[in-house]
């Protein structure tokens, strides 16, 4: 789907149905309002395989040989709508996502979900704010979110790793495997026991 234009959903406008992409391209389309590539307000939007949704714009001008100006607006998600990653995304292009709501200092915005082996944050790009990278938050399913992280200065740990937690989305930052290589100190000199992140 290429070279189309509309007020909303220059390439595809899904209002009350499902959209399933297991490959194919939605490229170089334009919308005057939202969703240069896809405007999705339907029931489910599943993606997998070699999907390419890129080069779509909002407010661009068609030159006959392409689009000039405008802003990146590949997939537009109104409040509460997300993409489901139904299988591995094998394409080389990131899927750009623009959301109606935006993250703030107390709230993240979810853009996608799927199992941990398929929902990879590097396959997506958040278009509302290029400084915000898409992050993965693990649970029964993996959520891909746009978040203005507020990382704790304290360490959280399990049996194998330690990391810092975001107070907003509860995501992990800089997980590090325990090494247990702290210098051994005589018991009489210890203020407290050594851990994997601090010496005795």
Where are these regions (language model features)?
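Right-handed parallel beta-helix
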Residues: 1-3, 18-30, 46-55, 86-89
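Extracellular beta-strand/beta-solenoid scaffold signature
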Residues: 5-14, 30-39, 61-80
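Short, solvent-exposed coil/turn segments at beta-strand boundaries
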Residues: 21, 48-51, 138-139, 165-169
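Thrombospondin type-1
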Residues: 23, 147-200
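Extracellular/surface-exposed low-complexity segments
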Residues: 48-50, 56, 62-150
């Amino acid at each position: 789907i290429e070279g189309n234009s509309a007020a909303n959903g220059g390439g595809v406008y899904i209002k009350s149905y499902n959209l399933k992409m297991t490959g194919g391209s939605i490229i170089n389309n334009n919308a005057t309002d939202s969703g240069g590539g896809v405007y999705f307000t339907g029931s489910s939007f599943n993606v997998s395989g070699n999907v390419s949704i890129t080069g779509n714009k909002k407010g661009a001008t068609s030159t006959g040989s392409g689009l000039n100006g405008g802003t990146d607006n590949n997939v537009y998600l109104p409040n509460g709508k997300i993409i489901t990653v139904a299988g591995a995304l094998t394409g080389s292009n990131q899927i750009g996502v623009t959301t109606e709501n935006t993250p703030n200092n107390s709230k993240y915005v979810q853009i996608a979900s799927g199992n941990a082996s398929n929902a990879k944050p590097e396959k997506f790009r958040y278009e509302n704010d290029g400084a915000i990278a898409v992050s993965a938050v693990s649970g029964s399913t993996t959520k891909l979110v746009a978040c203005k992280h507020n990382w704790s200065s304290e360490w959280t740990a399990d049996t194998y790793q330690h990391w810092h937690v975001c107070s907003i989305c509860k995501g992990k930052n800089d997980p590090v495997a325990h090494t247990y290589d702290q210098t051994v100190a005589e018991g009489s000199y210890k203020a407290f026991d050594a851990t994997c992140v601090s010496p005795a």
